[in-house]
Amino acid sequence: MNTTLDHLVVIAPSLEAGVAWCERTLGVTPGPGGQHPLMGTHNRLLRIDGPGFERAYLEIIAIEPGTTPLRQPPLRRWFDMDDAKLMQQVHADGPQLLHWVARTDALDSALACCAAHGWDRGPALQASRMTPSGLLQWRISVRGDGQRLLNGVLPTLIEWGDVHPADAMPASGLRLRRMRLQHPDATALQTWADAVGLKGVEWHVGPAALQATLSTPKGEVLLGSPE
C-alpha cells in the first residue's frame, strides 16, 4: 500500500475571500476549480508539488451561496463545513488551513487500518466530474456527520482514477517544503501512517495542529491551524 499527501484544505468564508487571502498571503492567484453539488461547495486550486510531495496541490474551499447540497440532512458536508463553531471561527478570522487529504492506491485497506485504531473515517463515496483534461474519477472517505476527526490531523483518504487534477495545473511558483502534524496521540498516528505506507509528513506530540511550510514569491510562508 502506498499513501502520500494529496492536498491541503484551506476553508474560507467565501471563495472570493479565499482568493484574496491567497493573493495576499502567498503572492499568487489560485487557478480554477469546480463545484461539488453533493456537498454544496466550490473551490479554487493551485499546484504546490515539490520534492517528496509529488502532485500535491492546495484547495481553497467554501460553501457555494444559493445552493442546497444534494446530500440532505442528517448527512452533513465534508470537512466539518456544517459545524457552526468552526465556520464562525472561519468567518471571524478568515481562511485557514484546517485539514488535509492523503491519496492512496488501496482505499479500502487504508480505511480498515483507520478502523483498527478506533477511527471511523467513514464510507468511501464515488465521485466524478468532467474537466478539459478528461474525466476525473475518485473515491473519497466522508463520514455521515462530516467530521474531520482529531481536529483535522487525521487525513481524509482519497483514491484517484486514471486522471489526477494536478497534472493539468500549471506551475504556480509555490512549493510545499514541510508538513508537520501535531497531536497528543502522535505515536498511534505514526503507527497508522507506517501501516498505510504514508511517508513525507512529520508527527509530533502536542496539542492538535497542522503546519505546512511553503516557498512562495513572498518567501517562506508557514500556514498553520489554530491550536
Where are these regions (language model features)?
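Glyoxalase I/VOC metalloenzyme domain signal
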Residues: M1-L5, I11-T29, T41, I48-E227
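Conserved catalytic-core motifs of GNAT/GCN5-like acyltransferases
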Residues: T29-P37
